[in-house]
Every structure is written in C-alpha cells, then in structure tokens.
Amino acid sequence: MNLFRRLSFELWYLRHPPWETGIVPPEVAEFIATHPPGCALDLGCGSGTSSLALARAGWTVCGVDFAEGAIRMARQKARLSGLTVDFHVADVTRLPSSILLTSYDLVLDIGCFHGLSPLERDTYLDGLDHLVAPGGCWMLYGFYLSGETPLHGSTVGKQYDHGKRLKLTWRRNGMDKKDQPSAWFCYRV
C-alpha cells in the first residue's frame, strides 16, 4: 500500500471522513435481515458501522482497515455499544494468518477494492477464493467505471476471473452522492 495514501487516510480519520456516514447501507441491512448469523469479514471496515450492525444481529465479525485511526474509532464504538468485534489494523492484500485461517459466510467490502491499484486488486482477488466459505457471499460496493483507470474505480467485472469459485449472483447499479456511477455486487460460492 502506498505510504502517501496511508498517511492521507490517517489524516482523514483525525477529522471526519466524508464516507463515514454512520449509516448501514440498505443492501447490508437487507442481507442481515435475510440471512442467519454466521461469520463475517469486513474488509476496509473504516469506523466499523457495518461490522457493528452485523455483530448486533448475532454475527461473529472481524473488521480490517489499514488506517489505525479508523480501527481506533471502530474499537471505541464497539466498546461503547457493548459489542464484540475483532478489529485489526492490516492491509487487505496482506492479511494476518489468523484471518486467513478462517472462512467466512460473508466477506463485505464497502469502498475498499475500488481504491486499490490493479496489482493490489489481483492480490486481493487471489486471496478471496480462500476466504469465502462454501455457500458464502462476497458483497462489494464501489465506484463503477466501464473503462480502466490506474487507481480508482471498480472494474471487478473485467478483472475477476469468472472461472473461479465465486459467481456473480446480482449487481445493483446506482449513483453516489456526487452522481458518480457506483454499483453493489454479490458473488456467491
């Protein structure tokens, strides 16, 4: 992960990042309402809003973010709400073995993948097949771009080898607050 990028995220978390709304996305709330609790991994969890919603619904949750400030906020929110979530400061392309040795019923990524470089995306996707449990789901939200850009935008449809274990089950196109194309994806084993 680029050092400048990491520092910029740390600076955002000294204030209040614009993406930290404190609102659980409707797609995540719908998933929680329609699936029994299991084991979840929240990649790029930020301040833990979705991780805590999953824990509140009975899920065993591990949240990962490379910004120490984000994880500090997430741990504080968990403590104040009386919820248990295993939060880690880590790079999603180099996860600790304690995380890699578990398989998850849900791997959630809200805006992490789309910020990775093409090489980092390849590394992330290579590890994904081992993280999602049989019958599990990888839910992804990101800016969606039809063309390739070097560092920003989700081109998961082009990059993910559909011959792998995970298959796209649904996609919901939308627009973010700045009218930038975005999409939710759900891949299942």
Give the role of each language-model region.
Residues 108:
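A conserved beta-strand element that flanks and buttresses the S-adenosyl-L-methionine
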Residues 1-41, 47-102, 116-131, 136-189:
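Class I (Rossmann-like) S-adenosyl-L-methionine-dependent methyltransferase catalytic domain
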Residues 111-115:
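Short catalytic micro-motifs in class I SAM-dependent methyltransferases
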